[in-house]
């Protein structure tokens, strides 16, 4: 089976693969961040959002993987084999978990649309030859809040507002869940 854990969130393994492996913080840092920002929601019996659920699952998977690694470390006699298993877990599985944790924490923190826009922007930046791209990569926290990701195949509506409606003079605020609320 070829399962893409990002598909239901509008992203893909391929889209995240543009980010270099050293881009993602350590699992310890990501777990600390998730705990500091979302502990109450993650430990709650209530369903908060698909991102909270995915984050819970990634954290549980990492815990089980660490239990397995501990068991292997205790029960595998050959030091070379033990080192191979530890290395494989840290390099391959660790990267996948770091990507999952980063994606869902970022979506909860910045909003899914902003994270998707960042992934697309970074993917375009990294594939552009160095001579033709800006020297610095896009930064997630500096993307404008008005970022809109359009679905392929849909053309934007081209309509001016009717003269009867008055437009507010203040800029429109993007609807998103408050960072203060846990869910």
UniProtKB/Swiss-Prot annotation:
Motif placement: Bipartite nuclear localization signal: 158-175
GO biological process, one term: viral penetration into host nucleus
Region feature Disordered, mapped onto this chain: 136-183
GO molecular function: DNA binding; RNA binding; structural molecule activity
Stretches for region 3 X 8 AA repeats of S-P-R-R-R-[PR]-S-Q: 155-177
Post-translational modification comment from the UniProt entry: Phosphorylated by host SRPK1, SRPK2, and maybe protein kinase C or GAPDH. Phosphorylation is critical for pregenomic RNA packaging. Protein kinase C phosphorylation is stimulated by HBx protein and may play a role in transport of the viral genome to the nucleus at the late step during the viral replication cycle.
Pfam families, A to Z: Hepatitis_core (PF00906)
Protein keywords: Capsid protein, Cytoplasmic inwards viral transport, DNA-binding, Host cytoplasm, Host-virus interaction, Microtubular inwards viral transport, Phosphoprotein, Repeat, RNA-binding, T=4 icosahedral capsid protein, Viral penetration into host nucleus, Virion, Virus entry into host cell
Subcellular location per the Swiss-Prot or TrEMBL entry: Virion; Host cytoplasm
Phosphoserine, modified sites: 155, 162, 170
Region (RNA binding): 177-183
Sequence repeats: 155-161, 162-169, 170-177
Main location: virion
Entry's Gene Ontology cellular component terms: host cell; host cell cytoplasm; T=4 icosahedral viral capsid
Subunit structure: Homodimerizes, then multimerizes. Interacts with cytosol exposed regions of viral L glycoprotein present in the reticulum-to-Golgi compartment. Interacts with human FLNB. Phosphorylated form interacts with host importin alpha; this interaction depends on the exposure of the NLS, which itself depends upon genome maturation and/or phosphorylation of the capsid protein. Interacts with host NUP153.
Job of this protein: Self assembles to form an icosahedral capsid. Most capsids appear to be large particles with an icosahedral symmetry of T=4 and consist of 240 copies of capsid protein, though a fraction forms smaller T=3 particles consisting of 180 capsid proteins. Entering capsids are transported along microtubules to the nucleus. Phosphorylation of the capsid is thought to induce exposure of nuclear localization signal in the C-terminal portion of the capsid protein that allows binding to the nuclear pore complex via the importin (karyopherin-) alpha and beta.
Family assignment from sequence similarity: Belongs to the orthohepadnavirus core antigen family.
Protein's name according to its UniProt entry: Capsid protein
Organism ancestry: Viruses, Riboviria, Pararnavirae, Artverviricota, Revtraviricetes
Gene: C
């Amino acid at each position: 089976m070829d399962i893409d854990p990002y598909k239901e969130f509008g992203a893909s393994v391929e889209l995240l693969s543009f980010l270099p492996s050293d881009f993602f913080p350590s699992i310890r840092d990501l777990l600390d961040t998730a705990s500091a920002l979302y502990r109450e929601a993650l430990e709650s019996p209530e369903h908060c959002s698909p991102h909270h659920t995915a984050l819970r699952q990634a954290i549980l998977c990492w815990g089980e993987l660490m239990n397995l690694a501990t068991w292997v470390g205790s029960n595998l006699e050959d030091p070379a084999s033990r080192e191979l298993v530890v290395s494989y877990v840290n390099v391959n599985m660790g990267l996948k978990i770091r990507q999952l944790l980063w994606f869902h924490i970022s979506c909860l923190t910045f909003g899914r649309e902003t994270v998707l826009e960042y992934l697309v922007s970074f993917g375009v930046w990294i594939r552009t030859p160095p001579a033709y791209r800006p020297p610095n990569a896009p930064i997630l926290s500096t993307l404008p809040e008005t970022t809109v990701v359009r679905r392929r195949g849909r053309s934007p509506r081209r309509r001016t507002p009717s003269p009867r409606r008055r437009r507010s003079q203040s800029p429109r605020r993007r609807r998103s869940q408050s960072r203060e609320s846990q869910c």
